């Protein structure tokens, strides 16, 4: 039985992201938290039992992304199956790494959404850092102003339109900044309880938001590629969803 409804897939196609809750068991959450805290305490002066050590305003990335209890949040949960329901069964390379992505409390109470976002890559992607679909998994509760992932709905369609326009001269896009796309929507913050997951299109404008809570945002970030990514990564001709089986079928 599929995890995603037709409405889910249509929402992803139109908005470039999809949020789902309750993707992890309590045991998966507990084990993932333990790995993150253990590595954080080994590598920094942060003490999980002393919130005064958590005020480090900004993102941090401890090690542990290849630990089985971290990778299992993707592969042993519904999340990777949902990825395949969008891109295609056996069409996505299973990643062996899910990067811990932390956002420390800022220590201030005034919160505003981020003014700008970015793309992780732009074609022709000569540095080979691109990806097909991204995943963000929260392994602790994240409040609306708690440093959640920010996405600009529909900005992937603007990016794809631009890339199609330059499909035969992608070198012309070198040096372009994501904000040159001028997203037509305001950012939406992804927040929710531990076990919340967000999938997003590789060409969606996104960012991190300011953490005005008293908790470290504990999240995992994953960038996944189509099996034929090296061949198709700069193919922006024709149907932009031709390599997404779950979207092309709509």
Identify the role of each PLM range.
Residues 1-15, 21-126, 241-248:
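Non-heme Fe(II)-dependent double-stranded beta-helix
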Residues 17-19, 134-138, 151, 187-189, ...:
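Conserved hydrophobic/aromatic beta-strand scaffold that supports enzyme active sites
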Residues 42-53, 194-199, 203-250:
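Non-heme Fe(II)/2-oxoglutarate
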Residues 79, 89, 105-111, 142-144, ...:
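Short, charged/polar surface micro-motifs in flexible loops or helix N-caps
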Residues 112-120, 169-185, 235-239:
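Short, surface-exposed loop/helix-turn segments at secondary-structure junctions
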Residues 112-113, 117, 127, 145-151, ...:
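A short secondary-structure junction signal
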Residues 124-144, 191-194, 223-226:
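Short, conserved beta-strand element in jelly-roll/cupin
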Residues 142-205, 229:
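Double-stranded beta-helix
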């Amino acid at each position: 039985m599929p995890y995603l409804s037709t409405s889910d897939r249509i929402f992803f196609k139109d908005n470039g992201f999809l949020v789902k809750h309750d993707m992890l068991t309590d045991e998966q959450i507990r084990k993932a938290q333990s790995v993150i805290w253990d590595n954080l305490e080994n590598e920094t002066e942060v003490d999980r039992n002393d919130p005064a050590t958590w005020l480090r305003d900004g993102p941090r990335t401890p090690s542990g992304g290849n630990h089985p209890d971290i990778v299992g949040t993707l592969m042993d949960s519904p999340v990777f199956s949902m990825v395949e329901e969008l891109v295609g069964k056996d069409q996505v390379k299973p990643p062996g790494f899910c990067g811990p992505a932390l956002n420390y409390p800022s220590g201030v109470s005034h919160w505003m959404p981020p003014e700008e976002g970015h793309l992780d890559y732009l074609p022709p992607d000569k540095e080979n850092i691109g990806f097909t679909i991204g995943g963000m998994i929260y392994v602790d509760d994240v409040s609306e102003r708690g440093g959640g992932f920010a996405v600009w709905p529909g900005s992937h369609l603007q990016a794809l339109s631009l890339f199609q326009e330059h499909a035969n001269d992608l070198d012309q896009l070198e040096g372009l900044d994501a904000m040159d796309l001028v997203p037509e929507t305001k950012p939406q913050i992804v927040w929710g309880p531990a076990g919340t997951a967000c999938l997003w299109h590789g060409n969606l404008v996104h960012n991190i938001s300011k953490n005005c809570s008293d908790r470290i945002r504990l999240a995992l970030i994953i960038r996944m590629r189509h099996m034929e990514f090296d061949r198709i990564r700069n193919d922006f001709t024709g149907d932009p969803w031709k390599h997404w089986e779950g979207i092309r079928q709509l």
